[in-house]
From Swiss-Prot:
Positions of the MTTase N-terminal domain: 10-128
Annotated GO CC locations: cytosol
Cofactor(s) it depends on: [4Fe-4S] cluster
Residue numbers binding [4Fe-4S] cluster 2: 165, 169, 172
Protein name stated in the entry: tRNA-2-methylthio-N(6)-dimethylallyladenosine synthase
Subunit and partners: Monomer.
Function: Catalyzes the methylthiolation of N6-(dimethylallyl)adenosine (i(6)A), leading to the formation of 2-methylthio-N6-(dimethylallyl)adenosine (ms(2)i(6)A) at position 37 in tRNAs that read codons beginning with uridine.
Organism: Clostridium perfringens (strain 13 / Type A)
Location of the protein in the cell: Cytoplasm
Reactions it catalyzes: N(6)-dimethylallyladenosine(37) in tRNA + (sulfur carrier)-SH + AH2 + 2 S-adenosyl-L-methionine = 2-methylsulfanyl-N(6)-dimethylallyladenosine(37) in tRNA + (sulfur carrier)-H + 5'-deoxyadenosine + L-methionine + A + S-adenosyl-L-homocysteine + 2 H(+)
Amino acid sequence: MTLENNMDKKLFCISTYGCQMNEEDSEKLSGMLKSQGYERTENKEEASIIIFNTCCVRENAENKVFGNLGQLKQLKKKNPNLVIAICGCMMQQVGMADKVLKTFPYVDIIFGTHNAHKFPEYLHRVLQEGVQVKEILNKEEGIVEGLPIDRKSDVKAFVTIMYGCNNFCTYCIVPYVRGRERSRKSEDIIKEIEELVSQGYKEITLLGQNVNSYGKGLEEDIDFAGLLRKVNEVKGLERVRFMTSHPKDLSDDVIMAIKECDKLCEQVHLPVQSGSSRILKEMNRHYDREYYLDLVKKIKSEIPDVTLTTDIIIGFPGETEEDFLDTLSLCEEVGYDSAFTFIYSRRNHTPADKMENQIPDDIKHDRFNRLVEAINKKVVIKNKEYEGKVVEVLVEGPSKNDETKLTGRTRNGKLVNFAGDEKLVGELVNLKIVRAQPFSLIGEIVE
């Protein structure tokens, strides 16, 4: 399907909300448009196509989308040929697409999480027939391979290995909007990684809602540990990361693969969500506090230099002060290198939304602030331990905060900023850490 647009400049702008899975979906949307002659811009004023790729994990993300959609009304009035598309998880929710069209009738295209590959077709219909397109598929179809991808980085890339989730945690809407678990064939994954390496990529991150479930439903006999060992054999690849792991499915085989495979980075993102066994049961997480702490001990004993990061939800329905203190003490015991902390957000059609004992906002915010303070104190102490050490860093590009500096990450995920020549981008360099900051390290090149 070719896209036709009479405008001299064929520019598009994509705003992405949410997780790395959404980021990779946006890279595919961008790739499809670029393959049709469009160029990307960050300036909505000059774009002929504006896409919002949405998230619905928290209410805050939805409110941002509504606010930004409202701001496009004047742009559409100024430029009636502007095409506005909205897609992603938020649109997959029951009734959301109709709500958006009723509130923002100037939106041209709406689609969900299962049919992003059909975007060129929808765009063609809007441009050629002047119609409004809304198509939300209620059931996931097969995995579409071979879509063009416009990567954000020339050094590291996301590679999705599976889609969907079967876990149904009581607070989470993801299984309802992303569908059931589907794994890509390992040969397709390896082929994509080999192509990336041939283009000069040094690091890949394997993505999935729960990567440890990889392989279920495939004809070939392979699990996640087996896939990791296959990926480790790709010549020219320097580093491999993965996310996200569900603690209940992180097997001994995966731990041993991280230990034994030289390209697998010593970093595990292991969402705990709560340190209270009672709350974990209410969340339907299928593990308790003791199981999680035993798993952490096992990981640390097999992989001594490992960094552990996590996700934590504060203010889940029924959470008492005692439950919260359990979370604080677990964080102290584990000693996370960083944590993504969230205030519980009610989501329609999830079991937790119907639970009694919803926590008042002021208590949620107080606990959230106490947790962040406790975690940050620990992170500062852990970062201090790097001062004077020499670490290997993959140089990713200019630092976001200071473009005169370069930035990169250690094998175990620590962010390091340093002065150096831009020719080093994409290279592995040894840096001596001269100063630790709360959320990053400052290094100097070791000659």
